[in-house]
Regions:
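N-terminal glycine/serine-rich phosphate-binding loop of ATP-dependent small-molecule kinases
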Residues: 1-94, 122, 216-232
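Short, charged, surface-exposed secondary-structure boundary motifs
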Residues: 41-44, 106-110, 181-183, 217
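Short alpha-helix plus adjacent loop in nuclease-associated cores
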Residues: 97-116
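Gly/Ser/Thr-rich active-site cleft segment
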Residues: 10-12, 121-240
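Residue-level signal for inorganic ion chemistry
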Residues: 49, 74, 101, 140, ...
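Acidic/polar active-site rim loop that often engages polyanionic ligands
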Residues: 86-93, 114-124, 137-140
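A charged helix-plus-loop insertion that forms the helical arch/lid used to bind
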Residues: 90-103, 177-181
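A generic structural motif
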Residues: 33-36, 99, 111, 176
Length: 241
């Protein structure tokens, strides 16, 4: 029996969905749809259009459904570091900031006046870059950003898209590691860093690792696409993990 898997692969300039099928000859891959990913510039800031990305994913699922294939599971990967602020009602508070936004220039240096650079690197083990989520969040906090102040949850990009498909909020390990918030030894979010930027573990979804089930497609997505309750599985959500 053939097993078909639906992959969503999103980069900073374009995205695609792919149908991968295991046959007696091995893995066969077919591109379902391909689409651009554009930045939105508003008020000298840069944002991603997550609703447009969702629309393209839904279209890919509809095409796959029309092919009559039975999809075993769905997985999503994206670029790293960017995230969505989610309100208490479960809605997105605004479009996600892009890592290309210049508002984080000088942010690491400002942060290291409070926690030494050596401590941050010792905990996280990743390269210090001004657009890492840690510094994005600290910049938003220092600027009294209204969306962050009102946020009940923060979802990284692949987790936000899986939430739109399933209604389940998770934090996948590989994408979270790009944030410079994950302790490389414990493989969990580092409380000392969260505390410094005014956040807690409760601001993040259930921590999951690649291979774990996130949830099935919501009834709404099933109706729109013509698919059943196909499971969405946590994959290595960072596209270069």
């Amino acid at each position: 029996m053939k097993q078909c898997f639906f992959a969503v692969d999103l980069g900073a300039t374009s995205g695609r969905t792919i149908l991968g099928t295991f046959t007696s000859n091995g893995l066969e891959m077919e591109e379902v749809n391909r689409f651009p990913n554009h930045l939105i510039e508003v008020g000298r800031h840069f944002y991603w259009d997550i609703y447009e990305l969702y629309r393209h994913i839904i279209e890919g699922l509809r095409i796959a459904a029309r092919k009559g294939v039975e999809i075993t599971s769905i997985g999503i990967d994206t670029w790293g570091v960017d995230f969505v602020c989610v309100g208490k009602d479960g809605g997105f508070l605004r479009q996600p900031n892009s890592y290309r936004d210049p508002h984080t220039v000088g942010a690491p240096e400002a942060f290291f006046t409070r926690i030494p650079r050596s401590h941050v690197y010792g905990w996280t083990g990743i390269q210090v870059m001004n657009f890492n989520s840690l510094f994005q969040l600290d910049t938003l906090r220092r600027n009294h950003d209204s969306a962050l102040a009102a946020a009940d949850k923060l979802l990284f990009m692949p987790d936000a898209l899986s939430y739109m498909l399933t209604g389940q909020m998770v934090t996948e390990y590989t994408i979270a590691s790009t944030a410079q918030l994950v302790n490389a030894n414990t493989r969990r979010l580092e409380d000392a860093l969260l505390q410094e930027i005014g956040l807690t573990q409760a601001h993040f979804g259930r921590f999951v690792y690649p291979g774990e089930k996130i949830g099935g497609l919501t009834e709404e997505v099933q109706r729109i696409t013509g698919l059943g309750a196909v499971p969405v599985i946590a994959v290595a959500g960072h596209d270069t993990a």
